[in-house]
Amino acid sequence: MSTRCAIGLKRENGEVAAIYCHNDGYPEGVGAILGRWYRNAEKVEALLKLGSISSLGAKLEPEAGAEHAFFNRQQDVTYAYHRDRKDPETSATVYPSVKSYSENARKDFWADFLYLFDNGKWLVFGSNGDWVEIKTEK
């Protein structure tokens, strides 16, 4: 069974851009990877440019010249539907505010968890309806 999630970035204008992630969306999976490996807005923007992803890895790009395919994935590399499986390209969904993201992204993405990179910190939308900071080892 997949644990789906949405990964979002709050931009300076208050909008939230978000993508879908199909696997390991729980805080100990995607949450831990985001907190450890995606620590600045530039890297999060690069992740969002991939569009929808099957799985999140510590690395965004596969090694040059090495195969990275659905049944032969490089270890710790993000697997993107368009780039790696040649599915139609998808772009990030943009919400006008964090409130809109909180209220709509779960149903839009069929997501169990929502993540948000806001002002240098990763947050997860908790089951109590609040954003909670993800604490990870550095």
Predicted feature locations:
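Short, extreme N-terminal segment that most often corresponds to the first beta-strand
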Residues: M1-Y26
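Extracellular/luminal recognition modules and glycoprotein regions
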Residues: T3, G25-L34, V77-T78
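Low-complexity intrinsically disordered segments
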Residues: G35-K138
